[in-house]
Every structure is written in C-alpha cells, then in structure tokens.
Amino acid sequence: MSEIIFIVEQAPEGGFTARALGEAIFTQAEDAADLHARVRDAVHCHFEDGKAPKMIRLHFVRDEVITA
C-alpha cells in the first residue's frame, strides 16, 4: 500500500476527528498540528514494521449551512 486516506471532520465539541478509509484506524485531536502527529502515530501503530503506507492523505470535510 503506497497511500492511506483519512476523512477529517470538525468534532462537535471542538477539534478534529479522523478515520481511515478501508482500515480500522480512528483518532482525534484539538488542532491541525496535533492531528498530523496523532494520525502518523496511529498509522505506524496499526501496520507491522515495513508495511505502513508511504503517504498519508488527509481529506478535510466541512459542512456549511447558509440561509436560502
């Protein structure tokens, strides 16, 4: 596997949640810098040595509501 994709959303209580597509990996963080570190750590803990993907893609999803 050369890449893993995480869907990142703003948590209702603040901060971010991130979940991997196709793998059972989930983490949360208070800010973007902390999120980067936690996602890297979660990926390295999930995969055996030498099996982790070379690239981690964070796809930020944000809902925006406007009046009609």
Residue ranges of model-derived segments:
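Short aromatic-glycine-(Arg/Gly/Cys) micro-motifs in beta-strand/loop hairpins
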Residues: I4, V8-A20
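Residue-level signal for pocket-adjacent positions within structured domains
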Residues: A20-L21, K51
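A short, exposed loop/beta-hairpin motif centered on an aromatic-Gly-Thr core
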Residues: E23-D34
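ATP/adenylate-binding site constellation spanning eukaryotic-like Ser/Thr protein kinases
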Residues: E13, E23, R40
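Short, charged, surface-exposed hinge/linker loops at domain edges
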Residues: M1-I5, A33, A37-A68
